[in-house]
Amino acid sequence: MKPLRPLLLDEMPEEWNLGEGPDYRRKQIAEWIYRKRAASIAEMSNLSAPLRRHLETAYDFTALKLARLQGSGDTTRKLLWELRSGDYVESVLIPASPDLFGGRSGRFTLCLSTQVGCAYGCKFCASGLEGWKRDLTAGEIVAQILETERTANTRVNNLVFMGMGEPLANYANLMRSLHIINAPWGAGIGARHITISTSGLAPQIRELARQPLQIRLALSLHGATDEVRGQIMPVNRKYPLAELLEACAEYQEKKGKMMTLEYILIDGVNDSAEQAEILARHARRLRAKVNLIPYNTVEGLGWQRPGEFAIDRFAAVLRGAKVTTTVRREKGHDIDAACGQLRLKQLKTDAGANRMDG
């Protein structure tokens, strides 16, 4: 069976219109899928019975199912999805979260995954501990939004591509999903409510700059010099800071939007005053905001978050250099909301069950 959800409007078969005018039924079907967030084809009540039967027999409507749901004391919800392939990915729903640019907000933000695992091997991250397995399809990316809304009984209105995987390494499916998410016939979420976070794939940043959508960009920097960044982010060997920051400058110039430099603070690794001073120079060059993220510990990794004094000192250096700076107090700390942790627990559970079955 073919997946129904990743179809673009102009890809839906013309015979669905049943002679009732261009795009008539296709728009109805798209509205049921993306606007009304139908849970099944059977809910599409204004379609003819023969058309519903055809859709049910020829198309697969469910790209993923909920495997685990964890709630945090701060109302963050972490969702673990099982894909039809048997793989797992995570999404995180963050109610009433402040936006990345410092404003207060009552939005419901959803953090999306784009890959099963990750190939980029950032030393502090749980997503890459099991390596990269495959890219998500556009349908699997969009389904995270629709199924989260159904599970939480709320409408998501802000998206951040900061979950498992490197979004720009799955560029074609990312752009296809964005087309569906942003389109009036699709999920209808405006581009200015969408942020893509990247570990620093310079060519794809330049390609994204040429796209018409006014999407926000967040760079996972985490080190202000090649020496420090290279220790914890292997991608820096392929795209060192000079090349990466030049690509970001091109993006900022073409889009005219403030971008964010994300910086996870790790005790004794990247939290020195010298790193803060160099980071401030990068931020001023790009006219960027800095989002400091005290490290969210990951089981099996030895990194630690700095103490409050070191965090405040680092932020003070940036603010003293007139760089807009926020310190993000991680949400979902009590539910392992750092990328990939819930998936790793599920994989260990499955492995234990398999050993017992054997």
Stretch-by-stretch model annotation:
Residues 36, 98-99, 128-132, 225-226, ...:
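A short, flexible beta-alpha/helix-coil linker loop
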Residues 98-140:
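Canonical Radical SAM [4Fe-4S] cluster-binding loop centered on the CxxxCxxC motif
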